[in-house]
Amino acid sequence: MQVLPPSSTGGPSRLFIMRPVATTLLMVAILLAGIIGYRALPVSALPEVDYPTIQVVTLYPGASPDVMTSAVTAPLERQFGQMSGLKQMSSQSSGGASVITLQFQLTLPLDVAEQEVQAAINAATNLLPSDLPNPPVYSKVNPADPPIMTLAVTSTAMPMTQVEDMVETRVAQKISQISGVGLVTLSGGQRPAVRVKLNAQAIAALGLTSETVRTAITGANVNSAKGSLDGPSRAVTLSANDQMQSAEEYRQLIIAYQNGAPIRLGDVATVEQGAENSWLGAWANKEQAIVMNVQRQPGANIISTADSIRQMLPQLTESLPKSVKVTVLSDRTTNIRASVNDTQFELMMAIALVVMIIYLFLRNIPATIIPGVAVPLSLIGTFAVMVFLDFSINNLTLMALTIATGFVVDDAIVVIENISRYIEKGEKPLAAALKGAGEIGFTIISLTFSLIAVLIPLLFMGDIVGRLFREFAITLAVAILISAVVSLTLTPMMCARMLSQESLRKQNRFSRASEKMFDRIIAAYGRGLAKVLNHPWLTLSVALSTLLLSVLLWVFIPKGFFPVQDNGIIQGTLQAPQSSSFANMAQRQRQVADVILQDPAVQSLTSFVGVDGTNPSLNSARLQINLKPLDERDDRVQKVIARLQTAVDKVPGVDLFLQPTQDLTIDTQVSRTQYQFTLQATSLDALSTWVPQLVEKLQQLPQLSDVSSDWQDQGLVAYVNVDRDSASRLGISMADVDNALYNAFGQRLISTIYTQANQYRVVLEHNTENTPGLAALDTIRLTSSDGGVVPLSSIAKIEQRFAPLSINHLDQFPVTTISFNMPDNYSLGDAVQAIMDTEKTLNLPVDITTQFQGSTLAFQSALGSTVWLIVAAVVAMYIVLGILYESFIHPITILSTLPTAGVGALLALLIAGSELDVIAIIGIILLIGIVKKNAIMMIDFALAAEREQGMSPRDAIYQACLLRFRPILMTTLAALLGALPLMLSTGVGAELRRPLGIGMVGGLVVSQVLTLFTTPVIYLLFDRLALWTKSRFARHEEEA
């Protein structure tokens, strides 16, 4: 039995080396747990980091923006403003619609927020208009979040009113019940109704008014309790023909008698089956349709929600007539799956490249198999922990695993290389494994914990960016930790069983040639290192220059927030002159649709015109452009957008604003372009003065493009200026005037038709076909106190004025949003700085405040914390290394490698034309953890040589550099090749992955070249500093 020296006991690895069966079974258990975890993990585009968001919609047909603001929005806002945990409240009040978006703190559960919203709505009920057709309705959805699925329902044989009725009752309700669905909206406005169009001349000739008609209809159509009869032996329920169901029944309704003869509704009005709101329309491509948009709840998994919808659709469509066709126009999960699949492929490529580089260096199949087992085992085992932490398989976690490929192989390489060295010296494999693993154990622990220390600050990042990268950091840390365990257990055990002197010495022609090549490289490195050590101050100046260059590059490199992704869907806003009518806007929309559908990259188009919960005014339209899959089109989304805008510019009288949909949605409202900047004031007058001035200035900036604001104060208003004294003499109140106008022009919902499946409305309005425009006001008649009929024109004058088409609030104060994009040659950082400089030149009054919103605000926050994040990572690593080495000096030597990584990463981003965004910054932080391993391996062996062999510091560090040159080169190339697939990524979602790969590859290349020379020099300089300090202390003690 061989007696091993104490130094060769194997340390923590001994138990696993000596018990191969137990070690193998333990690793099999990790593998099985990881496989089970992988199958159980949900799939998503990004980690679920949505703010809890609730949208409250109140519809009041016929109400002006001013009435909606004062009568509906303001009372609700006052109640919502008292809720705890509310982060931001924004509202939009337009003609007939109030939309309030409530964004809560990340820490507040959505269900709790829902309860608070419902309580606030209940408290505001008594403050809202008594004739509000429906109470406020809330949905757990972020309106700025694009729908996860868009469906178009069309029919060649049925009217759209019947189609919408069937979709609403048979399809939309069922989809709404699916877990994860936050809101199902039907765009197209074809809800069935009975429309009563009064003939103003006919009722005037008969001495009637619209109020007489309204009262007659509401009194004739009721549906209330009537009681029952309870006799000695039988109980009888009472019922009556109090409901009118069809247009024909309403035509026959008697509304008055004159000279004993009945006047029926059909005599004074056109009564027909129609749509509840005739100023709404939706189209799928060029065909009128009911468009169904499905939005998810904040925090819901998009893939599982879409899968549930897909599974239910065949069953739902079977319940519809054959002539009704349901088409899935867009499904965001298609691109998400493609992006995740591409990332998984890049992960497999990284593993293959890493194994290839191992074989290139070790030139031995058994030695290659060992890390070839360790790498996938470490990665697969990570899935088990991810399930326990409620993570998902998404682009960021897969990117973490791809990067981890280069990390986790480091530990195995270091162990194998050290054990192989002892076997080549003649040691038995078992003894070599015990000795090599024991010797390298501390290095593995140092590498692991110092690398994890770099990730710790990521866990404490605040707000949504911190939530976003928490899964990334923890996934990477778990993979690194499992890798360390595998490298100290399975790897030395396999080395003891699979490696031998014969296998290591067995060489073919390739092995001999590559060995000679490596020997020449090491010899050349040794000669270069000797020269460098003879000129330490020159080398130190190079190191300081890299630090200075890093700072300069950091200042001047273009900065961004989050890469703009190509998800194959473009959201658009079409803007026409502010006085445009529904019919005019619908015509313009069809012209634009024709142009867009001619583009070869466009697959389908949905568009919507009218005022509802998403569209604020009649002069705007919403579009969703669905592009062909990436492999079926030649251009990326930004080029398609530029091409479409150029084509639509030829359509007169419209402006088209386009932006690609993104997986990360921070905004709370649908804006015209990608980025937002707000002006908030205490009054609308202040905004009307300063918004046009600021917009004009911003439109002149070269750093901005597509600058526009949602401030529209030139909407035409017919102001009815009532002579109150004259009206009072006639016994006419302002309520009478409002009612008469509402009856005539408000599409007033005056009664409800109840059926077993749904409820439908009776809509009252004037027939204005023969009296268009302001002339229609001359037909209004009111009833005086003596029963006479009085023309409105006798007590009022009509004035044409201008007023806002919508009134927006942010946290209860008036606000306007300025939207903008950037040209290709400018970054978000350039745009933000230009806006801030322009704002200063305007000298805005103190009652106007400005703030960036959405992703621009998040960019500012992330940019402000980035430097502190990097400093925190460096400090955390210094603390860990100081504890491990029991030294204040050696951690500084190790950390001196960091500027070289920064220079390499920033130069690579600059050359590639990539911005320094959040993804790239994460790459730089990871580089901090990677590049210091070169110094750790050098310093560990140098300290051991000084301590055990009595070498001088210069000889020790020189020998350590030559001994560790091969594993340093091997591990660096492994990390580089692990990041290379990300850098070369071209598939779906490549925009998200590429900055990480570019930064890491650039940083690794530069740091590999420089740290091999700068680290030994800095090690010796600090060693001399330590000796000088000790001698100074010793001299002071002697003198004392």
UniProtKB/Swiss-Prot annotation:
Instruction: Provide the alphabetized UniProt keywords.
Output: Cell inner membrane, Cell membrane, Membrane, Transmembrane, Transmembrane helix, Transport
Q: Name one GO molecular function term.
A: xenobiotic transmembrane transporter activity
Is the keyword Transmembrane helix assigned to this protein? yes
Protein localization: Cell inner membrane
Q: Entry's InterPro entries?
A: AcrB_DN_DC_subdom (IPR027463), Acrflvin-R (IPR001036), Multidrug-R_MdtB (IPR022831)
Please report what switches on or represses expression of this protein: The mdtABC operon is transcriptionally activated by BaeR.
Q: Which Gene3D superfamilies match?
A: Multidrug efflux transporter AcrB pore domain (3.30.70.1440), Multidrug efflux transporter AcrB pore domain like (3.30.70.1320), Multidrug efflux transporter AcrB TolC docking domain, DN and DC subdomains (3.30.2090.10), Multidrug efflux transporter AcrB transmembrane domain (1.20.1640.10)
- Kindly list the GO CC terms recorded for this protein: plasma membrane
How the protein sits in the membrane? Multi-pass membrane protein
Question: Can you name this protein?
Answer: Multidrug resistance protein MdtB
Protein source organism: Escherichia fergusonii (strain ATCC 35469 / DSM 13698 / CCUG 18766 / IAM 14443 / JCM 21226 / LMG 7866 / NBRC 102419 / NCTC 12128 / CDC 0568-73)
